[in-house]
């Protein structure tokens, strides 16, 4: 690569969205709907990640945890929430564990130890 050259290209689907103002953008279908994500819930979840980092060390969950452990914990936190327990943020804890299971599916599929999920293809955003 020569100096000043950009190593990245702007990807192009070949399809366009034309806005009422006349501006044009590439289509966004199939890329996910980032604008609809409930960011106030993500901010709440981020506090759970912050507290977990203090207890276990940041990125600990990325080292590899069996999916069964994440699912077990998520279910337990949902049950505690439904039972009215408010000793901790059980919904944030459940969300953390569901995201952890999804992370293992995507980055460390060998950690998926659930008998009915072993060896099965899981959703891959990047396909």
Give residue spans per PLM region.
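Intrinsically disordered, low-complexity regulatory regions
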Residues: 1-127
């Amino acid at each position: 690569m020569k100096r000043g050259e950009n190593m990245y290209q702007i990807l192009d689907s070949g399809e366009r969205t034309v806005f009422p103002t006349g501006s044009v953008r590439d289509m966004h279908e199939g890329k996910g709907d980032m604008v609809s994500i409930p960011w106030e819930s993500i901010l709440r979840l981020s506090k759970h990640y912050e507290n977990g980092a203090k207890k276990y060390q940041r990125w600990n969950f990325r080292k590899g945890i069996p999916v069964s452990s994440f699912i077990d914990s998520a279910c337990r936190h949902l049950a505690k929430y439904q039972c009215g327990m408010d000793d901790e943020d059980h919904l944030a804890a459940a969300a953390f564990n569901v995201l952890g299971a999804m992370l293992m599916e995507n980055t460390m599929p060998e950690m998926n130890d659930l008998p009915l999920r072993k060896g099965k293809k899981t959703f891959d955003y990047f396909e």
